[in-house]
Design a protein with these regions (language model features):
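Short, internal strand/loop/helix patches
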Residues: 276, 439-471, 477-479
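Oxidative protein folding and maturation machinery
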Residues: 57-384
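Short Pro-Gly-centered beta-turn/loop motif in secreted/extracellular proteins
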Residues: 6, 12-21
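Thiol-based oxidoreductase modules, predominantly thioredoxin-like and allied folds used
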Residues: 419-434, 444-458
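Conserved helix-turn-beta segment immediately C-terminal to the redox Cys motif
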Residues: 388-389, 406-426, 497, 502-504
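Conserved redox-active cysteine motifs that mediate thiol-disulfide chemistry
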Residues: 386, 394-411, 428-430
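Thiol-/selenol-based redox modules, centered on thioredoxin-like
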Residues: 476-505
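A short, solvent-exposed beta-strand micro-motif common in secreted/extracellular proteins
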Residues: 19-29
C-alpha cells in the first residue's frame, strides 16, 4: 500500500487488517518495522533531520518501544550463510545432512545471542512493557522457523534430517504465536512447514476416493459403475498373481488384455466424467490430513484448506464443482476464508456463463482429425494466414507466467498492428472451461488472433516439433512460412518490435 507525499511531507493511508499485524513503513528507505491494529488511527512522525521517530495513537506504547529499541537479530538464510561463513555458493538439493545440521547449529547460536541481548536490554530498561518483550521473543522464534524451513530447498534430495525437523516442530512450530497475522514471516513459515509435511504423506488411492464419495453421496455412480470400482482391486490382484512366473511377452499380453477390458473402460469413464470432483476431493483430503498431522486448531485448518481451494481456482481458472462448494459451506467455519473462496469462484462462474459460441477467435480443428505428425498439424493450422508474420504462443491455463503475459495482450496487439501479424495461441493440458475463461478474463481476442486447444497427442506432437521445453514458449514464422530460430518473446515489447521489423523487411 502506498500514498503520495504532500508538499509538507505528510501522507495518509488506510490499510485493511484482520488482526494485529506486523508492517514495514517506508519500505526501501527507512525499513521501519512496526505493528498496526484494526480500527486504530496512528500518527507516525519520522524526522529525517534529527532521526526522531514517534507514534501517537490510542495505544501506541508497543510501536514506540519497537522504534526506540528495535530487534537485534543476525539470522542468515542458507545462501547468505554459505556466502559469508563458507565463502561459497550453495545449489538447490545439494546439502548433506551434516551440512544442514551445521546450519541449524549456527542459527541456534544466533537465536541465543538475540535472546541474550534482549535480556540485557530488559535489565538496562526495566520499564519496558511485557508486551514488547513477548513480541520480540516470539518474533525471533517465528523468524527462526521461517528461515529454517527454507532449508528444505537446499537439502540433498530435498529431505531434511529428522533431528532438524524435530527441532523446528518443538522449538518453533509448537511455540507459534497468535494471532497468526502477527508476524510477516508466519505466512512463509506455515506454508513451508505444511508443504513439507504434506510431501511426506502418501496419496489417497483413487479407487478408494471414488467409493468413499459414492458412499457419502457427494458423487453419483450407477450400479454398474459402483460394481466396477468394487471389483477393480480384486481384479488387479488376480492379474498380479497371473503374471508371476510368466515371460515378458506373456506379461505384456495379459496386461494389455486387462487394460483393454470392459472393467478398465468403465473405471476410466468415471474418472473422466468426475475428474474435477475427484481432483478437488483429493485436494481437500490432503489438506485435512496435513492439518491433522501438524496438530493445528480449527482456524489454521480452515485457513489452510480454504487457501488450497483458492489457489486451485486461481490456477485452474475455473469454478469448483458443486459438491466442493457444498463441502466448503458446510465445513469451513472461518467466515473470511470461506468468503474469499466463494468470491473468486463466483468470478469464474460468471466468466463460464459468457457465450463464446460465435467467437471467431476459437479456431476450428475439424480439419486436423487423423493427423499425427507435429509439423503437418502446425502447417495445417497456420495455412489460412500464409503471407503474415505469425507469433506462436505455447501456453497453459495452469502456467502463472503465461497468464501474466496474457494480461498485456491488447498492448501487444496495439503495438504490432502495423506489421500485419497473426497471433496463434496453442493451449497445453488445459480444460475447455479453463481455456475459455482465461481468454475471456484477459481479453485475448482480436481481428488477427486465434486460439486452439488440441487433443493431448496432437498438442504433444506440435510441441515435439517446436522443441518446447518451458512455458510460455514463443516462436516466429516469417511471411514465407519459415520457422525462425530467434528469441520471439514478446514480453520485452521493444526488442520484439525490432525483431519483427527485421523479419518483415
Amino acid at each position: 500500500f502506498n500514498a503520495p507525499l504532500e508538499s509538507e511531507g505528510r501522507f495518509k493511508i488506510t490499510v485493511p487488517v484482520l488482526n494485529t499485524t506486523q508492517v514495514y513503513v517506508d519500505w526501501g528507505r527507512s525499513y521501519i518495522n512496526t505493528v498496526i491494529e484494526p480500527g486504530e488511527t496512528y500518527y507516525f512522525l519520522d524526522d529525517v533531520k534529527t532521526g526522531q521517530r514517534l507514534v501517537m495513537g490510542k495505544d501506541a506504547r508497543l510501536q514506540n518501544e519497537l522504534w526506540a529499541y528495535p530487534e537485534e537479530i543476525g539470522y542468515y538464510n542458507v545462501q547468505r550463510y554459505y556466502r559469508e561463513v563458507h565463502h561459497s555458493k550453495v545449489a538447490f538439493g545439494s546439502l548433506a545432512d551434516k551440512e544442514v545440521m551445521e546450519y541449524l547449529d549456527f542459527m541456534k547460536q544466533n537465536k541465543q545471542e538475540a535472546d541474550s541481548l534482549l535480556d540485557l536490554r530488559i535489565k538496562e530498561h526495566p520499564h519496558l512493557s511485557t508486551r514488547y518483550v513477548n513480541y520480540l521473543r516470539n518474533y525471533y522464534t517465528t523468524n527462526l522457523g521461517a528461515y529454517l524451513m527454507q532449508t528444505r530447498f537446499y537439502a540433498k534430495d530435498y529431505k531434511l534430517p529428522k533431528d532438524f525437523m524435530d527441532f523446528v516442530t518443538t522449538e518453533c512450530w509448537a511455540r507459534r504465536s497468535v494471532p497468526y497475522t502477527l508476524y510477516c514471516d508466519m505466512n512463509d513459515f506455515t506454508n513451508d512447514y505444511f508443504e513439507y509435511i504434506g510431501e511426506g504423506l502418501s496419496g489417497t488411492d483413487a479407487i478408494d476416493l471414488v467409493l468413499t464419495h459414492d458412499q457419502k453421496g457427494t458423487i453419483t455412480l450407477s450400479e454398474t459403475e459402483r460394481q466396477a470400482f468394487q471389483n477393480y482391486k480384486g481384479e488387479v490382484e488376480q492379474l498380479r498373481k497371473a503374471v508371476e512366473g510368466c515371460t515378458v511377452e506373456e506379461k505384456k499380453a495379459l496386461v494389455e488384455d486387462f487394460n483393454n477390458g470392459e472393467l478398465v473402460a468403465q473405471v476410466n469413464k468415471v474418472f473422466i466424467r468426475l475428474q474435477s470432483e475427484l481432483r478437488e476431493a483429493d485436494l481437500i483430503d490432503r489438506a485435512q490430513r496435513v492439518t491433522e498431522k501438524v496438530k493445528c486448531g480449527s482456524v489454521l485448518r480452515d485457513f489452510y484448506t480454504a487457501h488450497a481451494l483458492y489457489d486451485y481456482i486461481d490456477n485452474m481458472r475455473q469454478p469448483l464443482a458443486e459438491m466442493t462448494i457444498d463441502w466448503l459451506n458446510e465445513n469451513i467455519k472461518l467466515d473470511f476464508a470461506r468468503q474469499q473462496v466463494l468470491a473468486l469462484n463466483e468470478k469464474y462462474e460468471a466468466l463460464s456463463r459468457k457465450d463464446f459460441s460465435n467467437s471467431t477467435n476459437l479456431l476450428s480443428t475439424d480439419n486436423l482429425e487423423g493427423i499425427t505428425e507435429g509439423e503437418q498439424i502446425l502447417r495445417k493450422i497456420i495455412e489460412p494466414w500464409k503471407g503474415k508474420i505469425i507469433l506462436i504462443d505455447v501456453w497453459g491455463t495452469w502456467c502463472r507466467p503465461c497468464k501474466e503475459a496474457m494480461k498485456h495482450s491488447q498492448e501487444l496487439y496495439e503495438r504490432m498492428k502495423a506489421y500485419d501479424m497473426f497471433f496463434l495461441y496453442m493451449a497445453n493440458n488445459s480444460s475447455e472451461t479453463s481455456w475459455k475463461n482465461v481468454i475471456n478474463e484477459y481479453n485475448v481476442t482480436g481481428e488477427n488472433v486465434g486460439h486452439v486447444n488440441l487433443p493431448t497427442d496432437q498438442q504433444s506432437a506440435v510441441e515435439d516439433f517446436l522443441k518446447v521445453n518451458s512455458y510460455p514458449s514463443y516462436f516466429l514464422i516469417d511471411r514465407e512460412g519459415h520457422l525462425l530460430e530467434v528469441n520471439a518473446d514478446p514480453r520485452n515489447l521493444d526488442q520484439f518490435e525490432e525483431l519483427v521489423k527485421r523479419v518483415g523487411k
